[in-house]
Amino acid sequence: YTYPFWWESFRPYLYQNCTPEKKTYDLIIIGSGYTGISSAIEACSQNLKTLLIDQSALGEGASTRSAGMVSGGLNLGKKINLFQEYGNQIATDFIRESIDSYRFLEDQINGHHNDVKYQKTGRLVLAHSKKKVEALKKKTELLNSLTNLKLEFLKDVNHEISNDYYKGGMLVHDAASIHPSLFYKFLLNKALRCKLDIF
């Protein structure tokens, strides 16, 4: 059995602090990944009596296994055209909400960048064909018209990456890396300071 590289810094563990039988809760959350534990922290901040349930070690699933590259608004609509599927207003709202989630993350870890190994790295999205270059150029223009991401379309990417393969790219300044397991530890410590029942 092998475990993820990220667990060398923090390994998920089994934890219970209650026996929930015959108790009443305002909210029961099933699953203790990023979504579950973040929801539990928010619920506790609103004085909701909350129970967080997980059958496995806390954060053992995808949250502490996936590479920690973060940005907002870039990957929406990979499989479908959001604007055709949902219309202009809802598609625009999706994109802006995604960007807001990135800002929310930055607010949550403010003052704790070293604890979670958060670094503003930027991101380079590359295109390998003329068709992909045109699509990326349109995406850059669209996102710049809807947001304040200040994305840069690059006809020549050789000053970013030495290659003979890629025909163009999009430079994203507002992107970062975070250590997924240490970020989970940060959230877990926050949750354990709340009046939160975990089973």
What are these regions (language model features)?
Residues 154-163, 197-199:
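A conserved short coil-to-beta-strand element within the FAD-binding core of flavoproteins
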Residues 73-156:
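Dinucleotide-binding Rossmann-like beta1-alpha1 core, especially the glycine-rich loop
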Residues 134, 141-142, 165-199:
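Helical element adjacent to the flavin cofactor pocket in flavoenzyme catalytic cores
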Residues 24-52:
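N-terminal Rossmann-like FAD-binding beta1-loop-alpha1 element of flavoenzymes
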